Structure formats: C-alpha cells, structure tokens
Amino acid sequence: HQRVTLNDGHSIPVLGFITYAPDEVIKPGEEMFPTDEHGKSIGVSNFNHKRVXNQVEXHPYLNQSKDIVLVAYSALGSSRDPWKQSPALIALRYQLQRGVVVLAKSFIEREIKVFGFQLSSEDMK
C-alpha cells in the first residue's frame, strides 16, 4: 500500500473517484521511528529498518535468505502414513524444525501435540 497526496485544487469527484499526484508518494520519515535503545527494530514490512518478525505466507519451498524469523500463523492444514500424524501436525512440526515461530490455533488437543515426533533430515528437504 502506498499513501499518495491529492492534487492541489482538485476536489474528489461525485462517483468516488479521486485525483491524486502519483509523483508525490508520501514516505514515512525517519523521525517517525526512534533510533535510540528503545527502537532497534520493528516487525512491519515496507520500512528500511531491519525487521525482527514478519507475518507472511510460508510453504515448504520458501527461501528464507534474509535472516528474518518467520512466524507461521495458524499453520494447520488430515492423515499421512509414515508418522501416523495429520497433515496439520506434519506442517507444524516442519515449521518448528525450521526454526519458525508457530502460532497454532486449535480446540482439538490431538491437533497441537507436535512434540511427540520428529521429521528426519530427508523429510525436511
């Protein structure tokens, strides 16, 4: 999302279409973000500061080469034979073994027992 300025002297047309100045994109100034010990990093995209965490879509083939900790939000996905576990648990275990912080939501206890098994290095490929 980009914030833009409206053209000076122009009003918003009746049908809801607006006129804007595309060359005048509003960028957040550095003064918005503290640079002392209270603001070392932020968890929001589209800023120049190094992010601590960023909530994004992740899948097993996603390349994480920028040293950003990935948070797997609601990463639940029914039974895969070798582990006798649901695909949801396999997906959760996969993310945990990759070092991703997983925020799982479930009211079913068996769907969050992710520490009772481990994936092999071959499974992780």
UniProtKB/Swiss-Prot annotation:
The keyword Hydrolase does not apply. Disulfide bonds: none annotated. Strongly inhibited by sulfhydryl reagents and quercetin, but not by pyrazole, barbital and indomethacine. NADP(+) binds at residues 9-18, 74-111. One of its GO terms (cellular component) is cytoplasm. Optimum pH is 9.4 with NAD as the cofactor. Keywords: Alkaloid metabolism, Cytoplasm, NAD, NADP, Oxidoreductase. Belongs to the aldo/keto reductase family. Monomer. This is Morphine 6-dehydrogenase. It comes from Oryctolagus cuniculus (Rabbit).
